[in-house]
Amino acid sequence: MHSCGQILEILPHLIEAGVNVVNLMQPNVFPIPRLAQFKGKVCFEVCADAQSSLPKGDEAVIAKEIQGLLDACCSPSGGLIEVQLDRMYFEGDNVPRPIGAFCHAEYRRRDPFLQQT
């Protein structure tokens, strides 16, 4: 399921109805630490915030956001799928192209389950 908005109040009902993956374009509207209450119950498909973080291209801000998403969402039973940035982000949201590679590298570097292998 895709959401560009704040669905925190209805998310438990969506999970109960069978939603198991939520595509988030703007995770900062929740805020991110509140996503932890759903750890192990649903998987979030996300990169970083498509409106507040990615277009600015500030690597320090994006890296902190990625770490927050990993901390809030990752569990042994699932929780996060990294969205790989593509043309939609670069052309539609004005995300600088180098940020795509940066985000992927940050997820690889920070993923707690990749660190175990």
Please annotate each region the language model reported.
Residues 1-117:
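Active-site loop segments of alpha/beta catalytic cores
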